[in-house]
Regions:
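Short beta-strand->loop micro-motif that forms the acidic, two-metal-ion catalytic signature
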Residues: 57-59
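Catalytic core of pol beta-like nucleotidyltransferases
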Residues: 1-38, 46-52, 63-110
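Conserved histidines in hydrophobic membrane contexts and catalytic metal-binding motifs
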Residues: 41
Length: 110
């Protein structure tokens, strides 16, 4: 596995939800470096409805939630996936959107 500061960009290979999951799982050690306790996809990525310009919606829970972990993970995922990443923590979920997000959740790291 590459060290946390080395990113392999797989965005040209992402054509399905399964590709996205495989890439994230292959990079699990680096995700853990950023303190990821659990990571789940939601939205179009979880429903396998991503399009060329789609962002990737990610719900993440950290072992230790710090600004450095959050920003580091966001930039790492965007570099890795070649897409904008909407990174959300459970505390940031709004009550109005929480039910629709929860029904889509597809855990990749838990």
């Amino acid at each position: 596995m590459p060290p946390p500061n080395k990113v392999y960009n797989f965005y040209m290979l992402i054509s399905s939800r399964d590709d996205l999951i495989a890439i994230l799982k292959a990079n699990r050690p680096t995700l853990q470096h950023y303190g990821v306790k659990s990571l789940a996809l939601f939205g179009s990525a979880a429903r396998d409805k991503m399009r060329k310009g789609s962002d990737v919606d990610v719900l993440v829970q950290f072992d230790q939630s710090t600004w450095k972990n959050y920003i580091g993970l966001k930039f790492y995922l965007e570099d890795l996936l070649g897409r904008e990443v909407d990174l959300v923590t459970p505390k940031a979920l709004k009550p109005a959107t929480k039910p629709s997000i929860e029904k889509d959740l597809l855990y990749v790291v838990s």
